[in-house]
From Swiss-Prot:
InterPro entries: Alpha_tubulin (IPR002452), Beta-tubulin_BS (IPR013838), Tub_FtsZ_C (IPR008280), Tubulin (IPR000217), Tubulin/FtsZ-like_C (IPR037103), Tubulin/FtsZ_2-layer-sand-dom (IPR018316), Tubulin/FtsZ_GTPase_sf (IPR036525), Tubulin_C (IPR023123). Its EC number is 3.6.5.-. It comes from the Eukaryota. The gene is TUBA6. Dimer of alpha and beta chains. A typical microtubule is a hollow water-filled tube with an outer diameter of 25 nm and an inner diameter of 15 nM. Alpha-beta heterodimers associate head-to-tail to form protofilaments running lengthwise along the microtubule wall with the beta-tubulin subunit facing the microtubule plus end conferring a structural polarity. Microtubules usually have 13 protofilaments but different protofilament numbers can be found in some organisms and specialized cells. The active site is at E254. This is Tubulin alpha-6 chain.
Amino acid sequence: MREIISIHIGQAGIQVGNACWELYCLEHGIEPDGTMPSDTSVGVAHDAFNTFFSETGSGKHVPRAIFVDLEPTVIDEVRTGSYRQLFHPEQLISGKEDAANNFARGHYTVGKEIVDLCLDRVRKLADNCTGLQGFLVFNAVGGGTGSGLGSLLLERLSVDYGKKSKLGFTIYPSPQVSTAVVEPYNSVLSTHSLLEHTDVAVLLDNEAIYDICRRSLDIERPTYTNLNRLISQIISSLTTSLRFDGAINVDVTEFQTNLVPYPRIHFMLSSYAPVISAEKAYHEQLSVPEITNAVFEPSSMMAKCDPRHGKYMACCLMYRGDVVPKDVNAAVATIKTKRTVQFVDWCPTGFKCGINYQPPSVVPGGDLAKVQRAVCMISNNTAVAEVFSRIDHKFDLMYAKRAFVHWYVGEGMEEGEFSEAREDLAALEKDYEEVGAEGADDEGDEGDDY
């Protein structure tokens, strides 16, 4: 089996996790208590969904996941929520004091105490797998737990499971909306280790998703639940090929191979279509070409950055539902002729497509309409650098005055770590610039390998 372990860290990671597991359960017909009426082969672990769920002897399906937070309130909601019987109590790990929006607390002081317990639980999950394929890590980098403990866990996973791939779903601070003053510090410090310790990181930002909810779903004041349900659709689409037997399957390691041209250039944009409310769905024809065009629209991107300002290096299209390869090929051919979708000149093909015949499910009473077919795109575009330069700029404004730095130093960090992380990000911006530059002939020494 090719199992995947999901790790949800901090408030954002846990709440996105709730939305994801709710959706997975719906898709597989698993009840909130973990039973699966349709599963005839009880105890046989050969079904495709066993990549995400482990099956107990009594026929209960338990998510291969852990939820970690440094303070209990958010995890207590899981412990008392409608899916409380789905998880083993040991999978929900909470501390007593939170990271107070401070990377250093999450990474050094408070996080240190809980990280061994987390790794212990991960080890138990891993021992339960026959062929662990990798980890999905969910966190936000603006707060303290997601950024600090998130980085710490990623670093430790690299040590313990060096060869396994790690996919991050990372919520980045939005340009306008902010939940903490020190977001730029936490993000820069955390990205420093995301660079090293994740193989693919999908960037999400709340503001972009708010806008999609407002515009496409007519929700005037979107809540986190609305946002997370949209995010969970993306994550579900990415993982359908692992959880169902499909037509053209896309494996986690395949993502890496097809999306990451150079190890550091692994920050992805994602988009999903059709995002449409039930009232509108009746009146629109959502054909394969239409939804394919929609995912390339700048307004569909789940992070605030404009793909037209950059060039695509690669993109992965995951279709699900009533889709045949012929339609996909036609739609992709049309996209290639568009001038707005520009590829770097050293990567002319750039499309990886997957199709899964399982139609998209929606949460009953949710905002999204039930549709016949949907597509999710994960793309590697040089415009992602906009996200970093925005955060770097805010970081510089504060760091020039050393504002708030004493809180970090007081928790055992050294000032040098700030400048080290900041330099790493400056180098990353530069990397993106070079990758998107016209022609690769200015790097003469690299062309001689052929």
